[in-house]
Amino acid sequence: MVKTVMIVGGQRKNLPFFWLAEFPGTERGKMYCQINAGGLYGLQSYVAQVEVDISKGLPCFDMVGLLDSEVREARERLRVSLHHINAALPAEKITVNYSPAGIVKSGTSFDLPTALVILAAQGKVPPERLKELWAVGEVGLDARIKQVRGVLAMLHAANQSAFRSYLIPFENLGEGIAAGKLPVMGVCSLEEAMEYVNASAQEQERMRRDAEDRWQSQTKGGMEKEKKAPDFALLCGMEEAKRAAMIAAAGAHNLLLAGPPGTGKTMLARCLPGILPPMSEEEKQEVSAIYSAAGQLEDGRLIQERPFVSPHHTASVYAMTGGGAVPKPGMVTLAHRGVLFLDEMTEFKRQTLDVLRQPMEEGKIFLARSRGNFVYPADFMLLGATNPCPCGYYPDRNRCRCQDWEVHRYLARLSGPLLDRMDLCCQIKQTPIRKLWEKREASYIDSDKNGSKWMREQVLEARKRQQMRCRGAAMRENGRLSPGEILKYCPLGLEEQEFLEQASEQAGLSMRGCHRVIRVARTIADLEGKDRIGVEHLGQALFFRNQNVLRE
């Protein structure tokens, strides 16, 4: 064995050559290597570093860095997978460190970077190339690279560091393409990852193109046709409800529908996405990153349509807001930039409904958990549908068999503060049967002013007016205007002020209620192409503000 002489504690000692790596100030040689990786902490993505040190000593495999069980279990997965590619772990002391050490590492995305950094320390791949490489992916026992969640969100964070290349699972390649013009390579196996790292720059570029073409060809046949919302023209009658839906879509207002069973409340809600304005590219990236972190991004493609989330009435508080020590996105976050539809709203538990009050007001949800405090986006439009009583036919006493106390208890699940945040309330009554026999041809649907095509055009025009009004500032829908912005963008004349004062005294409106009436009136004026809010606009807003529709 090669030995060297070193002064230790004033004494001359003959030491094995490889012990030099254990003393401060000496070079570690090729037994140390580092690679970049990505992780998720709730919805927040971050760039991590994976370091490995292989030194002489009793054979062991230590992993440090505040790791969750999913990351620690990678030890056995990697032991078997590396053996499958004839790169078994050396019978030495292996220490893997994950930084930053102050963040809990969870998920299986650290498998691939850990495997690559061990291979580099063994000399299987060039260690210097890993310093500019970013990698995530789960490694199976057969050395295949499997899909992980949150790749799109992690790529957004990694893009700020401008790495030379990005290595992800082939199944996540759609998210890599959606992240922008990044040099992203999708690999199917650990051997393919090694081949990519060992290749030249020109060869790597060719491999990236081939992987993208292969992914496009595989997903092209499986692409589903775009799901279209039902057309509003298919709804018979319901002019007031259609008007309320158009106002809600134009200004991002909350809407409550009440009426007997079978009157079309749910059908109207399903039609609403068909008249909503399209998302901007920034909103598509934002919403897609949320769904990627939740593991619900289909085919890794950017979400094109606004989310429409409809939880079951048995959903718990944690399902609505997000559950877990590091909470996953709940229903309110999945509905971000879209619609949260609560069918049979009075069947939800009251505490489940009351947690909606904060995100309805602020557009985000604050969660306090054992591992920290989290703030998730939750800017949605709430759409509720409910029956007026347990049987659904109140106040028709010919059909309703509910006692007064039963009706009161049933409606009491909708608290006053929650109802005060509903901008629009609309009662839907039974439609006469003769409406069903009216002619419904395709040409009629296209030309009908109550059809989705015409309504969508009106909504887009109203949104353009809002955008022009907020020119030079961040675009905000009328339903999201702050009190200061209401004074700036929604001025009232003397006649309108007197009208609103009298109406608010008669209806007992709160200050928040008055603000919401002004917001709705501003949207109605935008739909009619008016620059100023008139008395007629305030009157229509007050008509839809009537919250006694549940008891009429």
Regions found by a protein language model. Give the residues of each.
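Walker B catalytic acidic pair
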Residues: 343-344
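Walker A/P-loop
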Residues: 257-296
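Short beta-strand elements
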Residues: 45-54, 320, 423-430
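Peripheral, non-AAA+ core regions of ATP-driven protein-machinery
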Residues: 2-9, 14-18, 22-256, 260, ...
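Basic, amphipathic alpha-helical bundle interface domains used for macromolecular binding and assembly
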Residues: 67-75, 90, 97-107, 326-327, ...
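Inter-Walker segment of RecA-like/P-loop motor cores
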Residues: 302-311, 318-319
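Conserved alpha-helical scaffold flanking the Walker A/P-loop in AAA+ ATPase domains
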Residues: 318-339
